[in-house]
UniProtKB/Swiss-Prot annotation:
Chemical reaction(s) catalysed: 2,4-diacetamido-2,4,6-trideoxy-beta-L-altrose + phosphoenolpyruvate + H2O = pseudaminate + phosphate
Biological processes, Gene Ontology terms: carbohydrate biosynthetic process; glycosylation
Family to which the UniProt record says this protein belongs: Belongs to the pseudaminic acid synthase family.
Name of the protein this chain belongs to: Pseudaminic acid synthase
Species, as recorded: Campylobacter jejuni subsp. jejuni serotype O:23/36 (strain 81-176)
Keyword annotations from UniProtKB, A to Z: Metal-binding, Transferase
SUPFAM superfamilies in the record: AFP III-like domain, Aldolase
Family matches, as SMART domains: SAF
Highest taxon listed in the record's lineage: Bacteria
Gene3D superfamilies: Aldolase class I, Antifreeze-like/N-acetylneuraminic acid synthase C-terminal domain
GO molecular function, one term: metal ion binding
Amino acid sequence: MQIGNFNTDKKVFIIAELSANHAGSLEMALKSIKAAKKAGADAIKIQTYTPDSLTLNSDKEDFIIKGGLWDKRKLYELYESAKTPYEWHSQIFETAQNEGILCFSSPFAKEDIEFLKRFDPIAYKIASFEANDENFVRLIAKEKKPTIVSTGIATEEELFKICEIFKEEKNPDLIFLKCTSAYPTAIEDMNLKGIVSLKEKFNVEVGLSDHSFGFLAPVMAVALGARVIEKHFMLDKSIESEDSKFSLDFDEFKAMVDAVRQAESALGDGKLDLDEKALKNRVFARSLYASKDIKKGEIFSEENVKSVRPSFGLHPKFYQELLGKKASKDIEFGDALKESDFR
């Protein structure tokens, strides 16, 4: 799939998710974009919303978070604190372009989509908690841009509906990310085999949105067929934000990128044909050799013929055929046996 100038068929698409790791500072956001590029990210992703895009400014119990990193915080207050202000977007997209890193965003309401259109984004991202909103999904599908969907809390029925909507809107560029909507995610809760299930069941391109510590999961995900990896990124460990507890700093993210690139390199193309290096090593394969001096007319037997390394003699498949035949000439111990040596 083509996302901007990036082809996911050729390389795994690695996204640095900035989210709230700007910590309320535009300067921090711009520095993060530059650092993400240096760390090897293919794209920086932001989130485009106002608190009103996501929730109501209510003090009722329904709108108070219970448990986890954000325990007892009011939803509206959380999103007000974590947002990337509209007025930052122009500089964010401009900086990304200047740095040579792709940039796109997750909108959360119609107003956010309309705002983002002025930047002609290369793609859109639908967050896990918005995946059940069919009207919102359709608005995104109508934009005819590659769309990445986190599937963390979506049911199979909802995912099938997303596929149906994108088909109806004639938008074929859909990617499902396996995602566990827990912040942070325990490694035993990842269910990475779900990447394979998403690919097989929905026939879409797949990847991983990872909220676990470290980068074991992204490397394993690549081995399972992930073509997109999304991981939260921050400049350094001194940052305190709503997302910093499960984000990678520069050194960690760079190490993850290196590991992912090694993993995809190790996968190869899946062909079983021997490559040039393997063919060269065939010299150490077994072949048939004289294990004793053999006189002309002497019968080849288990006593004077062995299958040994290296491979300059007859292929071992001729061993049984050779036994019982007579030598056509004198053969010395250690000579590689040839077809001309027997009759």
